[in-house]
Amino acid sequence: MRLDMPCVETAHLLLRPVEEGDVCDMFTYYSDPLVMRYLSLHPHTDIEETLNSIRSYFLTWEKRGVPQAWVIVHKHDDKVIGNLDIHTIDGDIGEIGYLMHPDYWNQGLMREAVSALVKAGFAHVGLRRMEAYVAVEHPASAAVLKHCGFVQEGILRKLALLSDGRYHDMVLMSILKEYILTESFRLDK
């Protein structure tokens, strides 16, 4: 299993490992309550909090035994607009997570990024299965995953304590490596 992640270029995005120099752009979305509402993290209140997250979480991937996280760079304006990662590995199963600045929502950019992560997770990292948990109240995120080939497996009741301080039902979605080998599957659709 390879944990170093290559840089990947898509039609509109550059996906590359997180660096400390990304802190200003990352703070703009980590401090936004809209972005953080379906996550277990609270909005960041100052840039130091974001820098500490980069240092203690994103740059410790090797020690934690997970692949490097990517920032999502929008090629049109060369801004870091989000990040995504395979944040948990259990054998050959990886759990993914992602978030994006709201100015870039509803443009198909997260689908583009998640599709690239799925390809890298199976081809580069060597995973057999990838999973994501999505708050029931967040159908847009589930739609991103469905577009990328994930299927809903079920709903886990009151699974996650989110930033609002309440437990939420979460949809478990997954994709299998064998599925992407079928002719009916295309990540670039």
Task: Write out the residue ranges for each language-model feature.
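Conserved GNAT-fold acetyl-CoA-binding loop/helix
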Residues: 34-56, 68
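Hydrophobic residues in alpha-helical segments
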Residues: 30, 39, 61-62
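Juxtamembrane helix-loop transition sites at the ends of transmembrane segments
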Residues: 49, 55-58, 170, 175
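Acyl-donor (CoA/ACP) binding surface of acyl/acetyltransferases
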Residues: 1-25, 29-36, 71-189
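A short helix-loop-beta-strand connector motif used in the catalytic cores of GNAT acetyltransferases and
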Residues: 57-71
